[in-house]
C-alpha cells in the first residue's frame, strides 16, 4: 500500500487524509498535540511517497529532516488539484490571495456565481479545505479558493482558471526572510497559468506591478484611481467605457470593499455574467463577520468589530472608513514597523485604547509622532477598555468604537474569530 505522511491535523490536514484514503493510501498522521509526535514520526519516514505539511506549521527541524531525505513536501491544495486532474473534474478554480480583502472577495465571488445561476462554493483558507469540497460537493461549476502565502509555498502543478492578488503589504515577517520573499510566494498563485487562463491585476499596487510581467495568463487590470479594464472614476465603476454602478450604491462599504468589488466585477466580465445580475448582487451583498462589522448601537454609540485586521494595512482601511473614531488596537507582536500605524492614528483617531503585548511599542511610536498622551489609554485587555468606556460614555455620546487591532490575536486569543466573538459578547454584556 502507498504511504503518505500528513503533518498537522487542522482543516487542511484532515481534508487531505480523507481524500487520500479514498485513493487507497495509508496515511500516517503526525501532530505534536493530537497524534503521533514529530519526534516519534522520525522512525516512520521510510517508504513515504510524499509528505503533506499543514500551512500553519513552520519549516522546523522535522520538516527540514524530511526535505533532507529527499521526500517531496506538498501542501493540501496541490494534492487536491492533482486529484482534480486525475479524475478529469470539470470544476474550475478561481484562486484568490492578497494581504487584505481575500476572505471577503472569496466568499462574495462564490455568492455572485450562485446568484448568476452557477453552482459554486468557497474553500481554502476560509471554511473547508479544497479536498473536503471535492469529496462531498459533486458537479460544482466553480470553487472560489482563498489561499494564504503559507498554502502557496510548495506549488508544483496547481493552476487556477482565474487567479488574483488583491493587494500586497508587509506581513508575516516571522515566517519569511524578507517581505520580498513573502510577495514572491504570493505570486506562486499564477506561476503555472498560461494564455488560456486569467490573472486579475491590481495596477494600483506597487509590489504587484513589480512582478506582473512574469505572468503568462491573460491580464485583466483593475484600479481605484486610473483607467484600467475595470476602474473607478467620479465614484462610479466602469468596465472599459461602460458604466456599471455608482460606488455609493454598493452594499459593501469602505475603500477596501471598493477594491474587493473591482475584482468581483472583473471576474463577472471574464465569465460573461449578465451585468444586470451583477449590479443586482452588488447592491445586496452582505459583509463577512469580523470585517468592519457594525453589530451594535448603544444609543448614538456605534460598535464596529474589525477583528480580522491582523496587519497594519488592514487597520488603515478601517480607520479611513471610520475617521474620528475611538480605536481599540494591539495584540501579538509580529515584529513589523509600527510607524505608519502611529501616523494614521495621529491623523484620524480621536482616542486609542491599547491592548496586548504590543501596547508599549505602539505607545512609543505614538509619542514619537506627537500624539497626545491624554488620548492614549493602555488597559491591557478588551474587557478593561470597554469597562472604562462604559464609565465615560452615555447613550447620547456620538462615538464610533472601532476594534481594529492591526496585529494577530495569539497573545490573548485563539484566533481573530475568537477575539471578535469575545469583543461582541463583552459589548453586549457591558452595554446591552
Where are these regions (language model features)?
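Phosphate-binding loop of NTP-binding sites
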Residues: 2-3, 14, 18-23, 40-46, ...
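Nucleotide phosphate-binding/pyrophosphate-handling subdomain across enzymes
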Residues: 3, 15-19, 23, 119, ...
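Glycine-rich Rossmann-fold phosphate-binding loop(s) that bind the pyrophosphate
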Residues: 9
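Short internal beta-strands
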Residues: 29-31, 199-203, 328-329, 348-357
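Short acidic low-complexity segments
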Residues: 33-47, 381
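C-terminal helical cap/extension that packs against the catalytic core
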Residues: 341-399
